């Protein structure tokens, strides 16, 4: 009985990571403060994120010996730390923080990436999100 009570308390105090599949309009609302940052418009961000993660915070992609996490597909070699490889951890954060529904830390790291690498860090941007962006606007905002 004591084990069950202990497990119940742990479950209440430490809930599971809450991942989220955003819609275009939900994500537009959350990311509105990124509009214009580094001269990147909100529709450019929405388009890029759609193509790299499908608006899904739990997206993990393994590529060339590294791993990319979350909506912004932030790489573990430079930007965040995990238990897989040695990382510079420039954003000073655990990679698993990019898998939850709190995008505050994701946006802070994405801005740092943009400042250091530019928008071309996200390959989908140049190929798919640099023109004809009307479809990425949310009329509900």
From Swiss-Prot:
GO biological process: defense response to Gram-negative bacterium; defense response to Gram-positive bacterium; lactose biosynthetic process
Sample GO molecular function, one term: lactose synthase activity
One CC-aspect GO term: protein-containing complex
Tissue expression: Mammary gland specific. Secreted in milk.
Keywords: Calcium, Disulfide bond, Lactose biosynthesis, Metal-binding, Milk protein, Secreted, Signal
Protein localization: Secreted
KW RNA-binding (keyword) present: no
C-type lysozyme domain sequence ranges: 20-141
Binding site for Ca(2+): 97, 100, 102, 105-106
Family of the protein in this entry: Belongs to the glycosyl hydrolase 22 family.
Subunit structure: Lactose synthase (LS) is a heterodimer of a catalytic component, beta1,4-galactosyltransferase (beta4Gal-T1) and a regulatory component, alpha-lactalbumin (LA).
Protein name: Alpha-lactalbumin
Species name: Sus scrofa
